């Protein structure tokens, strides 16, 4: 099996990007160690702080953010970074080639119940000139690399540099990432979907009708049965989609009219969309392709529908219909 370093070399990845990806991978090993120790290290539970999103920070949110921030600040290839846990961008150096956006610990509500969590990252080219928030506001198509690390029964790194999606598994004996799937591929069709059903009454009419038709199974217009899955961590649900197909969505809702979207574009939706598209899937808000969106600010939120191409298309057909009346559920 190839190590991560061997794979990056065989793919012809230039030295600066290889260095940055190695920094991210090495930091994820330390994060994996911290996550595994959990209560033994006193890192579970919440802090008294809130992040810029107004969300209460878990202790591990802060710890993992600091670990990534410290490692990336020391990496000469990094010009600046943006994190879910940082109010503003962080300028790192004057000459780095890359900007890094990341969610240090996705699914942190799962920490205290010992369920799946992960790290998501996106790498963008650093433009010339003075660094500002505007420097980061690039469409997802500009990403040069993206990936996530899943901290589960084993620690796995899914990575794309625009040459498909590769999956690496951390060998606990050698502490090396080894290539265990050289070409992750999403099936075009599926009978699985992932959505937070507790928000059903708050969804837009197209999504309500789409999900209602899935739940009707063989007696409904789709004429086949579907199973629902929900891990409550985007990183876990998207990993399942990449592993065996499916559709994952966190759609628009009016639960809080001031926050109609849940997921962040720059460090959740964009990197996951890059991975999904590279594996043969599709990613949309319901009305536009996610990676074509020009961001308006670093913590911008969007609706997300991604996964098996034909099922995403089926969902989008509902969004193109006329809903002058609310569907009956």
From Swiss-Prot:
Homotetramer. One of its GO terms (biological process) is fructose 6-phosphate metabolic process. The keyword Magnesium applies. GO terms for cellular component: cytosol. The gene is fbp. It holds the Pfam family FBPase_C. It is found in: Cytoplasm. Mg(2+) 1 binds at residues 84, 103, 105. Pathway: Carbohydrate biosynthesis; gluconeogenesis. This is Fructose-1,6-bisphosphatase class 1. Binds 2 magnesium ions per subunit. One of its GO terms (molecular function) is fructose 1,6-bisphosphate 1-phosphatase activity. Belongs to the FBPase class 1 family. The keyword Hydrolase applies. Substrate binds at residues 106-109, 196, 262. Its EC number is 3.1.3.11. PANTHER family: FRUCTOSE-1,6-BISPHOSPHATASE-RELATED (PTHR11556), SEDOHEPTULOSE-1,7-BISPHOSPHATASE, CHLOROPLASTIC (PTHR11556:SF35).
């Amino acid at each position: 099996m190839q190590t991560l370093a061997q794979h990056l070399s065989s793919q012809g990845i230039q030295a600066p990007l290889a260095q940055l990806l190695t920094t991210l991978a090495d930091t994820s090993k330390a994060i994996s160690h911290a996550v595994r120790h959990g209560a033994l290290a006193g890192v579970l539970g919440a802090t008294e702080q809130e992040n810029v999103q107004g969300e209460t920070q878990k202790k591990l949110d802060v710890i993992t953010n600091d670990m990534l921030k410290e490692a990336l600040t020391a990496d000469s290839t990094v010009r600046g970074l943006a994190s879910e846990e940082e109010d503003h961008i962080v300028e790192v150096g004057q000459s780095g080639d890359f900007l890094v956006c990341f969610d240090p610990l996705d699914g942190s509500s799962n920490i205290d119940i010992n369920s799946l969590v992960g790290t998501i990252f996106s790498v963008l080219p650093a433009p010339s000139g003075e660094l500002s928030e505007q420097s980061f506001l690039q469409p997802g198509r500009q990403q040069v690399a993206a990936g996530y690390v899943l901290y589960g029964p084993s620690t796995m790194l899914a990575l794309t540099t625009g040459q498909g999606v590769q999956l690496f598994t951390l060998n606990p004996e050698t502490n090396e990432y080894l290539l265990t799937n050289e070409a992750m591929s999403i099936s075009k069709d599926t009978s699985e979907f992932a959505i937070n059903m507790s928000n059903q009454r708050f969804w837009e009419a197209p999504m309500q009708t789409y999900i209602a038709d899935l739940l009707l199974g063989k007696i409904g217009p789709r004429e086949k049965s579907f199973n629902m899955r929900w891990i409550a961590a985007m990183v876990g649900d998207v990993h399942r989609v990449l592993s065996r197909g499916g559709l994952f969505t966190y759609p628009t809702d009016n639960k809080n009219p001031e926050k109609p979207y849940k997921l962040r574009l720059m460090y959740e939706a964009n990197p996951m969309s890059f991975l999904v598209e590279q594996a043969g899937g599709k990613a949309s808000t319901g009305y536009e392709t996610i990676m074509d969106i020009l961001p308006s600010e670093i913590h911008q939120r969007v609706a997300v529908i991604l996964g098996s191409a034909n099922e995403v298309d089926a969902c989008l057909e509902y969004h193109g219909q006329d809903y002058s009346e609310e569907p009956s559920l």
